[in-house]
Amino acid sequence: MITMQNVRKKYKDFELELSLEIPEGRITGFVGKNGAGKSTAIKLILGLVKPDAGKICVFGNEGGELPAAVKQKIGVSLTESGFSSQFTVEDVWHILAKMYPDFQKDFFDQKCDVLKLPRKKKLKEFSTGMKAKLRVLTAISHKADLLILDEPTAGLDVEARNEILDLLREYIAQDEKRTILITSHISTDLESLCDDIYLIH
């Protein structure tokens, strides 16, 4: 599913070196303190930044920006990204329906009810927990084979964290070939969810 061989990325005051393999059907966690390189590792896998050295392979695609067909197979939730604060959940629904041929409209609607995400309220009025739940919901609503989630539970209370972790458990249980890569600086979140955990430091 994902392999990283002798991958290195260096910034002015930071250097990351990684070699790992994430097999199909596993939940893999990256744990480490803030600034350790978890988000950089995610961006390298997604082709958002280029490595200085080494080889990265995702779905058999080696290096560079991922092709559109591969992107359709991936659901992503990044901490610093999201939809415009002026959008409503209904707006997000329409965008996802256009972006993904396999977008599950009924599933999205049902989970909005379960997670108490109001459809007509602007996202700027959402709490931190509501925004986090929406980010994860958008990632899992188009039958992705691979989920990549960067700090999906950061800054959330216990109830919101548990709702997100339950969503992920339900998602992986629906298809044993589905794969999740999740990062967190809270090791207890990952210990209860993941098959494999890498310490990034």
Regions found by a protein language model. Name each.
Residues M1-S19, E24-R26, P67:
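A short, flexible loop at the N-terminus of ABC-type nucleotide-binding domains that lies
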Residues G54-E65, A69-V70:
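Conserved ABC transporter NBD signature motif
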